[in-house]
Amino acid sequence: MAMRNLLFWFALLTGGPAMAMEISSTAFGPGAPIPTRHTCEGNDVSPSLHWQGVPAGAKSLVLIVDDPDAPDPRAPRMTWVHWVLANLPVDTGGLPEGIETAALPKGTVEGLNDWKRTGYGGPCPPIGRHRYFHKLYALDVVLGGLKHPTKAQVEAAMKGHVLAHAELVGTYEKAGR
């Protein structure tokens, strides 16, 4: 009973239990199809993304969007990287639809996707319905020495510095496939 009382008072005095970090989009829900406008068959613009629950002590955020089902979800051989952003400010709260490089929050570093260019590259699966993971990481550091890093370079730099992780998964299959 004493422990329960202690936990109650701790939660009350600290503002309640810590909220888990979450990422969401107004364009699609968890497990739902990604609208065509965000794909190679549409305007190829990034979806709006929103997050909350970034933990205290976080110094930067990393966003990675990738597809583990490439090239064929029945026999995946690789993970295709669609977007890499590092050093997003922790107070950002999200990104609007179709954000351009010049409009990214100050300090954000754009990494290379698997088309060997920076910026968002939307879903464009050659075969079948693929899953697209929008992964957000809260780090206890601002990553240094990055200039157009690959996903692998960002993941290596953030190793041991992840405070929290959230993900949103959407799907896409080309019309008539």
Each PLM stretch: what is its role?
Residues 1-3:
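N-terminal secretory signal peptides that target proteins for export/translocation
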Residues 5-17:
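Bacterial N-terminal signal peptides
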Residues 19-177:
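N-terminus-centered regions that define maturation/targeting leaders and the start
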